[in-house]
């Protein structure tokens, strides 16, 4: 069931649109937030709480910070909870991480992608 998510062409198109804009150095928070909300609407029917939550936390984070301050999750989980969360906070707008975050939605059949989304969720909540 989870793999269906991004077989939804409409959601994929929106993700591609955001990624294209990022490549062209276009980072318009209001547009991105609207697109993420639309993607979230589409994905609600998947009944995948991790995905729905990740999208909501992402647009709330962007909305309140006007930037994406979450880093790419580490490959290996760090022993102490604190350093793990600190490592996932960026000092500046992290376009690379945001792009990676978006790419996770394009293939949710990969267990690691879902695990990384969970890490992003933890970092959003800790921010």
Describe every region a protein language model picked out:
Residues 6-44, 49-127:
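C-terminal-biased regions
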């Amino acid at each position: 069931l989870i793999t269906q998510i991004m077989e939804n062409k409409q959601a994929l198109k929106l993700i591609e649109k955001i990624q294209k804009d990022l490549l062209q150095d276009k980072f318009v928070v209001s547009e991105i937030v609207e697109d993420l909300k639309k993607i979230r609407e589409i994905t609600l029917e998947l009944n995948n709480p991790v995905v729905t939550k990740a999208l909501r936390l992402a647009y709330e984070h962007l909305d309140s910070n006007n930037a994406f301050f979450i880093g790419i999750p580490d490959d290996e989980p760090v022993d102490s909870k604190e350093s793990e969360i600190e490592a996932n906070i960026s000092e500046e707008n992290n376009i690379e991480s945001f792009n990676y975050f978006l790419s996770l939605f394009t293939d949710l059949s990969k267990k690691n992608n879902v695990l990384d989304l969970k890490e992003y969720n933890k970092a959003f909540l800790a921010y």
